[in-house]
Amino acid sequence: MTLEIKTSNVEPIRQNYAYIERRFGSKPATRYQEVSFDVQAETNFHYRPLWKPEKTLNDKTHTALQMQDWYAFKDPRQFYYGTYVQHRARLQDTAESNFAFFEKRQLAEHLSNEVKAKVIECLLPFRHVEQTANLHMMSGSAYGYGTVLTQACIYAAMDHLGIAQYISRIGLALDGNSGDSLQQAKQAWMQHPAWQGLRRLCEESLTEQDYFKLFLLQNLVIDGFVTELVYQQFDQWLVSQNARDLAMLTEFMKDTLGDLRKWSDTVIKTAAAESDHNKQLLNEWFTESLAQVKAAFTPWATAALTVDAVDQAEQAVIERAKKLGLQPLTNA
């Protein structure tokens, strides 16, 4: 008896969806491409937004920025919901492990009263700044154009909400979960002179209607100052005060802000390279935002660190902006 085994190849009729093929050609698409590109509705809207009847749903004119292709703002991390959740779950697992270790070893008892007081007064109120950052990025998700940008903005909004929650957890770790530290931090936020510039910045920024101006303000300038002043210089002060154990509780914040920078830098650089109009507009926004944020952080930096700390943070932000094709205007 002879047994013959025949094989045949099955060729798919289509490699991908039609909307993906129009952009990328007839080839297999990644999951990020399938859920991110050209999926936002553009026509046949049944009504205008009741809150802004002069606009349409998914309107490109919510920002003065102009793009030939709004899907040019692709995420280098290629985050869609599944990959984003998996990545952040790993960061959260590490953070939870760090907090559990801190509490199990009762490391808060080794901190001096001076350090605890300064952390409560100078670090914990940043949870309000992060809540504002959450709203800033919500604006990008609500009014932005193109799913590649809007989905990444909502992820960033959730990141800032997570940072705010972990800052609150630091307070609870210091006061034995009584919540007293959070009440003290709230009073500092509402009344201490060092915080009033940042309070004003947060409140006034929420009236801004251009979502991309908020994007630049938050991701380049505010996050730049926070990273340099809070998670570098203030962290170094903690080390000098034998409070290096607190550094493990801010690891989530540093890792998350570093990851957000990979994405936001790409978006800003792409926008600046699009046209001279965009570059001029972004430079004007950057110049305005840099002055506002520096003025807002100066009282805090003077109280928490040194007089020249805010100048170092400003220089770090300017150097970062130069790599993106931006610089402050000298005549502004």
Curated annotation (Swiss-Prot):
UniProt KW NAD keyword: yes
Keywords annotated in UniProt: Aromatic hydrocarbons catabolism, Monooxygenase, NAD, Oxidoreductase
Keyword Lipid biosynthesis applies: no
Coiled-coil regions listed: none
Pfam families: Phenol_Hydrox (PF02332)
InterPro entries, per the entry: Ferritin-like_SF, MP_mOase_hydro, Phenol_Hydrox, RNR-like
Catalytic activity: phenol + NADH + O2 + H(+) = catechol + NAD(+) + H2O
Segment forming the signal sequence: none
Source organism, top-level taxon: Bacteria
EC annotation from Swiss-Prot or TrEMBL: 1.14.13.244
Principal EC category: oxidoreductase
Induction: By phenol.
GO molecular function (one): phenol 2-monooxygenase activity
Pathway of action: Aromatic compound metabolism; phenol degradation
BP term (GO), one: aerobic phenol-containing compound catabolic process
Family stated for the protein in its record: Belongs to the TmoE/XamoE family.
Function statement: Part of a multicomponent enzyme which catalyzes the degradation of phenol and some of its methylated derivatives.
This protein's name: Phenol 2-monooxygenase, oxygenase component MhpL
Species: Acinetobacter pittii (strain PHEA-2)
